[in-house]
Amino acid sequence: MKVSIIGATGYGGLELIRLLHQHASVDIATLHSFSAQSETLATFYPHLKDLEASPLEKINSAEIIEKSDTVFIATPSGIAKDIALPYVDAGLNVIDLSGDFRLKDRQLYEKWYGKSAAPIEYIAKAEYGLAEFRDKKEARFIANPGCYATATLLGIAPLVISQLIDPTSIIVDAKSGISGAGKVPSASTHFTETNENMTLYKMNSHQHIPEIMQQLTKWDETIPAIQFSTSLIPITRGIFTTIYVKPKNPITQKELHTLYKSTYENAPFVRIQPENVYPTVKQVTASNYCDIGLAYNEKTNVITIVSVIDNLVKGAAGQAIQNLNIMANFAESDGLRFIPVYP
């Protein structure tokens, strides 16, 4: 399969290149960038020297359609809503890593992203690509989920789908490494601001909130809202999500683990930790795994779920490739089965 990557110089694009080089059924046909053309990626990223020689090109939709079967769009939000359309119309596989096609309500997108929304007919065509819970496995236009949304939804899905929790009780405390803010530097991601520091940001206003709610209410329409906070922590990669919920009825630790293990029995990238063991960010670094730990406090009747992912892999490029595997009828783990980087 021939693929093109638009937005190849960003962190998400770089991860796509790294991972696709390990995929036996995929060849990179073209690489595209808004900020640089004619040079190779190794000019900007020396770690790719002698590994990726394709030149960076301007975006030429006719050329991409001619040379590719699949297009990955790894641009900031607000760009894919325009540039994705010709590839969808041409019948190519299109996987958008931005937020432009995730929300089915155009007004919600414009409220939370502060940008004009994509045409409604294209939003309707896009399949939300939470890989473990895809509705239409044959879909060829995928809105890849956000990193916070992925960690949160995988962490809470078994309880919500089973309708075992008080729908008003969901509290999510999510923390991200600095790469989640993207490649373009800012005052808030400056080394001296982030090193030995932790910063709460976008309190009650993160754009992944409506995305999470859209999927949660699909599973349980009685959920009215969630309490959701996000923080930056001084690591390069990783999402560490702690979720608190109250079950409708008391539950044992064994019942909790049985529920999660049965839900994810056939999910190659979700690993449920043993009882009383909780995952760390380090154990999923540079991998497509989501590791989940569980606890129940019978005194407070609170379930705690710890869900960790690498924001650039399971939270972006890795899940995008997992979605490609599903749509192309490859093995779901093709190009993604490797040991996390440790230490």
UniProtKB/Swiss-Prot annotation:
Keywords: Amino-acid biosynthesis, Arginine biosynthesis, Cytoplasm, NADP, Oxidoreductase. It is found in: Cytoplasm. SUPFAM superfamilies: Glyceraldehyde-3-phosphate dehydrogenase-like, C-terminal domain (SSF55347), NAD(P)-binding Rossmann-fold domains (SSF51735). Transmembrane segments: none annotated. It comes from the Bacteria. One of its GO terms (cellular component) is cytoplasm. Coiled coil: none annotated. PROSITE patterns: ARGC (PS01224). Its EC number is 1.2.1.38. The active site is at 147. One of its GO terms (molecular function) is NAD binding. It catalyses: N-acetyl-L-glutamate 5-semialdehyde + phosphate + NADP(+) = N-acetyl-L-glutamyl 5-phosphate + NADPH + H(+). Pathway: Amino-acid biosynthesis; L-arginine biosynthesis; N(2)-acetyl-L-ornithine from L-glutamate: step 3/4. One of its GO terms (biological process) is L-arginine biosynthetic process. Belongs to the NAGSA dehydrogenase family. Type 1 subfamily. Catalyzes the NADPH-dependent reduction of N-acetyl-5-glutamyl phosphate to yield N-acetyl-L-glutamate 5-semialdehyde. This is N-acetyl-gamma-glutamyl-phosphate reductase.
